[in-house]
């Protein structure tokens, strides 16, 4: 019994120490409408969808320090999307956006995209 518990602790400690804490990406809500890995027809969902109560105009907030790596618009898939390269090398994707800022600026101090 001690061995499995010890193995669990060996796994748990580095996981907790290396865990990254990100900011919540919007002021819309903290409710999810879809989660990562949900099965969809012929594919798995590749993100988290946040409930916006069918309203637009909420802020998209950068989850961590980094820079805007790519901005795209497509008629299917993500629609209006911003890719942010984070300081830890990961990429945050802000998809299904209603619009981009009118003045085209990024406010890094407030972490608002």
Each predicted region: which residue ranges?
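Sec-dependent N-terminal signal peptides
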Residues: 4-15
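Surface-exposed, glycine-biased beta-strand/turn segments
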Residues: 18-91, 99-103, 107-111
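Conserved beta3 VAIK motif of the Hanks protein kinase fold
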Residues: 94
């Amino acid at each position: 019994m001690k061995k499995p518990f010890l193995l669990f602790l060996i796994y748990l400690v580095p996981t907790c120490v290396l865990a990254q804490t990100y900011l919540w990406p919007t002021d819309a809500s903290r409710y999810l409408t879809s989660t990562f890995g949900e099965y969809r027809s012929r594919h798995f969902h590749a993100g988290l969808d946040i409930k916006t109560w069918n309203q637009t105009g909420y802020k998209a907030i950068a989850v961590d320090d980094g820079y805007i790596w790519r901005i795209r618009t497509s008629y299917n898939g993500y629609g209006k999307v911003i890719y942010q390269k984070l300081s830890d090398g990961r990429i945050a994707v802000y998809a299904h956006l209603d619009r981009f800022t009118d003045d085209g600026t990024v406010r890094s101090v407030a972490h608002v995209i």
